């Protein structure tokens, strides 16, 4: 192409188009910095080393004077310049901003990390604030009490119930810790000691049973055995006193039922025979027995009325005898045999006397009769009470 621009040369004087395409030689390159003495001094003035950095107050005294000349004593030495612009310094921020060598360029990763940490800090702050607010809201006793009261729960009653249950459990634990003897004494030791002291004074004998509690225990056990023996004998006597009565279950044998039916038939036949004999005049009716029976009934009724009235006075009209019939037309009849009524069901029925269940006074008295020492007055008083 005619108007194609020429490629610049690489400093060797030969154009790039004239160089062979597949040449393997490495071309020479120019240095990045011109290290001539004049350029080095200029660079040293423009870029001082970090070791030569001083405070701003000291640097202001070394500035150029009014004529523009510098002090040779303050000029830095001829040192090769450094290309490291990132200077790590732990000094104050004032020193870093006062000199250009103290500045360091941040990396891209550092920016991202700083942004991430700032966001995380903000999120943590918000979360902590929200959690603190939630905790305050949850721990607010007034709001919680209002919610529980609306649900029908009384906090004070629940607390009282909890305290009572705790106190009950504590008291139960305390009672469980108390050791109870296996066998309690039959009599109280204090009462036994008082009675023994009283008896000792009557017998002119000074006794102090409280000093030796084993004496009280022995007396209590002796009284227990004595009472046990008396009660055992009374129970045995009461069992012997009561007879075992057979319970009538309502079932009878066929033989007894047949015998009863035969006896009833014989009784009816005998009564019919007696009536026929009276009607034929072979026997006379016994009026005297009837009158006697009526008189006894009147007397019994009079006695009952007198007892009810509370006076023993009897009136004549109450004791008047019944007039005997004197009709001439009455038929004479013989005496009815008294064994007829005896054979009937009008006779007395024998039954066993009702006994008191359990132990009664006479059982105890009979048990004490075998005890000859110190029971005479008790037995006499007991029998007197039974008679009354």
From Swiss-Prot:
Name the UniProt record assigns to this protein: Transcription initiation factor TFIID subunit 4
Organism: Saccharomyces cerevisiae (strain YJM789)
GO biological process: transcription initiation at RNA polymerase II promoter
Coiled coil: 279-297
Residues recorded as bearing Phosphoserine in the entry: 36, 49, 80
Keywords, in A-Z order: Coiled coil, Nucleus, Phosphoprotein, Transcription, Transcription regulation
Compositionally biased region (Basic and acidic residues): 106-126
Source organism superkingdom: Eukaryota
Localization per Swiss-Prot or TrEMBL: Nucleus
Pfam families referenced in this protein's UniProt entry, alphabetically: TAF4
Domain Histone-fold, residue spans: 193-261
MF GO annotations: DNA binding; RNA polymerase II general transcription initiation factor activity
Segments of skewed composition (Low complexity): 127-139
Subunit structure as annotated in this protein's UniProt entry: TAF4 heterodimerizes with TAF12, forming ultimately an octamer consisting of a TAF6/TAF9 heterotetramer core flanked by TAF4/TAF12 dimers on either side, similar to the histone H2A/H2B/H3/H4 octamer. The 1.2 MDa TFIID complex is composed of TATA binding protein (TBP) and the 14 TBP-associated factors. One copy of each TAF1, TAF2, TAF3, TAF7, TAF8, TAF11, TAF13, two copies of each TAF4, TAF5, TAF6, TAF9, TAF10, TAF12, and three copies of TAF14.
A GO CC term assigned to this protein in UniProt: transcription factor TFIID complex
InterPro entries per record: TAF4, TAF4_C
Composition-biased stretches (Polar residues): 12-22, 43-64, 79-98
UniProt function note: Functions as a component of the DNA-binding general transcription factor complex TFIID. Binding of TFIID to a promoter (with or without TATA element) is the initial step in pre-initiation complex (PIC) formation. TFIID plays a key role in the regulation of gene expression by RNA polymerase II through different activities such as transcription activator interaction, core promoter recognition and selectivity, TFIIA and TFIIB interaction, chromatin modification (histone acetylation by TAF1), facilitation of DNA opening and initiation of transcription.
Residue segments, region Disordered: 1-143
Entry similarity comment: Belongs to the TAF4 family.
């Amino acid at each position: 192409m005619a108007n194609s621009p020429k490629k610049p040369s690489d400093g060797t004087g030969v154009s790039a188009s004239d160089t062979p395409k597949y040449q393997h030689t490495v071309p020479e390159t120019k240095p990045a910095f011109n290290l001539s003495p004049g350029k080095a001094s200029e660079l040293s003035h423009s870029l001082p080393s970090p070791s030569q950095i001083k405070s701003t107050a000291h640097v202001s005294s070394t500035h150029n004077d009014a004529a523009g000349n510098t002090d040779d004593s303050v000029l830095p030495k001829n040192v090769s310049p450094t290309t490291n612009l990132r200077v790590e310094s732990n000094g104050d921020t004032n020193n870093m901003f006062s000199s250009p060598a103290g500045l360091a360029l941040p990396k891209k990763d550092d920016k991202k990390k700083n942004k991430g940490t700032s966001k995380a800090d903000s999120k943590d702050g918000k979360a902590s604030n929200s959690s603190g607010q939630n905790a305050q809201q949850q721990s607010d006793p007034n709001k919680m009490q209002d919610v529980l009261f609306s649900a029908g729960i009384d906090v004070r009653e629940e607390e009282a119930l909890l305290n009572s249950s705790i106190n009950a459990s504590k008291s139960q634990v305390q009672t469980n810790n108390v050791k109870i003897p296996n066998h309690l004494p039959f009599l109280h030791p204090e009462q036994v000691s008082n009675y023994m002291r009283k008896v000792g004074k009557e017998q002119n004998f000074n006794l102090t049973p409280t000093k030796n509690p084993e004496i009280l225990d022995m007396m209590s056990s002796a009284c227990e055995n004595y009472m046990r023996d008396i009660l055992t004998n009374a129970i045995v006597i009461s069992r012997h006193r009561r007879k075992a009565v057979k319970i009538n279950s309502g079932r009878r044998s066929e033989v007894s039922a047949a015998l009863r039916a035969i006896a009833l038939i014989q009784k009816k036949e005998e009564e019919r025979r007696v009536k026929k004999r009276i009607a034929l005049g072979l026997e006379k009716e016994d009026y005297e027995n009837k009158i006697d029976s009526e008189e006894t009934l009147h007397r019994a009724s009079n006695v009952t009325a007198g007892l009810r009235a509370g006076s023993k006075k009897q009136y004549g009209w109450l004791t008047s005898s019944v007039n005997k019939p004197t009709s001439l037309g009455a038929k004479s009849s013989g005496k009815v045999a008294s064994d007829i009524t005896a054979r009937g069901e009008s006779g007395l029925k024998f039954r066993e006397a009702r006994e008191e269940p359990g132990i009664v006074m006479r059982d105890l008295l009979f048990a004490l009769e075998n005890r000859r020492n110190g029971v005479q007055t008790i037995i006499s008083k007991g029998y007197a009470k039974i008679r009354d």
